[in-house]
Regions:
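N-terminal entry/capping and adjacent linker segments that precede and initiate structured domains
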Residues: 1-384
């Protein structure tokens, strides 16, 4: 009746069931809308336990790059008629801006030159991030990069693994490049702590590819082994992988397991995917093979003598980068499912090495930034 409080289905359900089983499955923006409906929903969805549980229930989706910013795959499944779509995360302030980034738990660190930012696109919180000073090297060309972002479980802090490096140039090209320095920063701190790389590596620095997060550690494929950074002890170690695959493999994040893929033929027309079957025993098993020559794509594939970049959408579906800047949607049997399309009709799509799993997770730096009257505006806008 008019003026009376309308009954809803949710009114008949226990409060804990609504919060833990219904609200915990919604996207962040919908949880925020529900917070405005009832005070009990607001308090129930504000606990750290809910925030972590909510994050674990969100799909982990590949990140797509284009000239105007950063997007993500729209969902973990797509109908054959509509195809796989992408939706924007961040939009650059102007055309021509290109930022490097790394992700963890719905947080992104983005940087360009010496400007670093940490943000949560789902909550639209952002703050400048301090970085370690450049180290003193023989070479005049030095730099600082982010290798990884992770949650340090014992303290609950989010920490950044940095690398400070030197690069040879000109007359210094004949000089052997000095070993990089690896440092750990707590987000919001300006006190770095140097950590030791396990051995002198001939395979270079892991900055070329972002790490795969798995079982609380960061993983890079380097040479004939996998380099692991244990985020609790904050130490490096080596993990074995199938030696018969050669010296160049690429890691693949399946969402619930660690995998790698490689092309063992000279023309790079077949891709073999291996999955880590037992993490502690470091045993791997062959999972499936994709034959690019047999893929009936439209337009036809342009086969290059290089390994294409892959990203997992779900147990059966993949994204594949096709030069120059085309994205394919296929399954693990090598069946072409369509071309990836943008809701805003962006072209020149590039598949990143990263995944995004939205969250309501915050860091103290966000609150400190809100209290600071002086704001360092980032060169992007969060649009998720």
């Amino acid at each position: 009746m008019p003026g009376s409080r309308a009954a809803t289905v949710l009114d008949d359900l226990p409060e804990w069931l609504v919060v833990d089983e219904i609200l915990a499955r919604l996207p962040v923006k919908d949880v925020f809308r529900c917070r405005a409906v009832r005070r009990s929903w607001r308090s129930g969805t504000s606990t750290y336990a809910f925030i972590l549980g909510h994050h674990r229930r969100q799909p982990s989706l590949p990140i797509i790059l284009h000239d105007h910013g950063i997007s993500r795959v729209a969902g973990a499944s797509a109908s054959a008629s509509s195809g796989q779509k992408i939706r924007p995360l961040l939009r650059y302030a102007s055309l021509g801006i290109c930022m490097r980034f790394i992700t963890c738990d719905g947080l992104l660190i983005l940087w360009r030159g010496s400007d670093f930012y940490i943000c949560n696109p789902a909550t639209r919180k952002c703050a400048p991030l301090s970085h370690p000073p450049r180290q003193q090297f023989i070479s005049p060309i030095t730099g600082v990069d982010v290798l990884g972002l992770y949650r340090h479980q014992p303290s609950g802090e989010y920490r950044v693994l940095w690398v400070s490096y030197a690069a040879p140039m000109g007359t210094f090209a004949a000089v052997k490049v000095e070993q990089p320095h690896y440092l750990v920063f707590t987000v919001g701190s300006d006190q770095p702590r140097r950590i030791q790389w396990p051995t002198v590596s001939e395979d270079g620095c892991p900055a070329a590819h972002p790490p795969i997060h798995h079982r609380g550690s960061l993983h890079w494929a380097m040479g004939c082994s996998i380099t692991v950074f244990e985020t609790i002890a904050e130490t490096f170690r080596q993990m074995s992988r199938p030696a018969q695959l050669g010296s160049y493999v690429l890691l693949l994040d399946t969402g619930d397991n660690l995998a790698l893929y490689v092309s063992t033929d000279h023309d790079r027309v077949t891709l073999d995917v291996w999955v880590l079957q037992d993490y502690d025993a470091e045993t791997w098993g062959f999972r499936y093979r994709i034959n690019l020559l047999a893929m009936d794509a439209s337009p036809p594939l342009k086969l290059w003598k290089s390994i294409p970049r892959l990203a997992v959408i779900n147990e059966r579906e993949l994204l594949m980068a096709q030069p120059p800047r085309r994205l394919l949607h296929c399954d693990i049997d090598g069946v072409f499912l369509g071309n990836v399309e943008s809701e805003e009709h962006e072209n020149r799509l590039t598949l990143s090495w990263h995944r995004f799993q939205e969250s309501m997770i915050s860091v103290p730096l966000f609150e400190a930034q809100e209290e600071d009257a002086v704001s360092n505006e980032p060169p992007f806008v969060m649009v998720l």
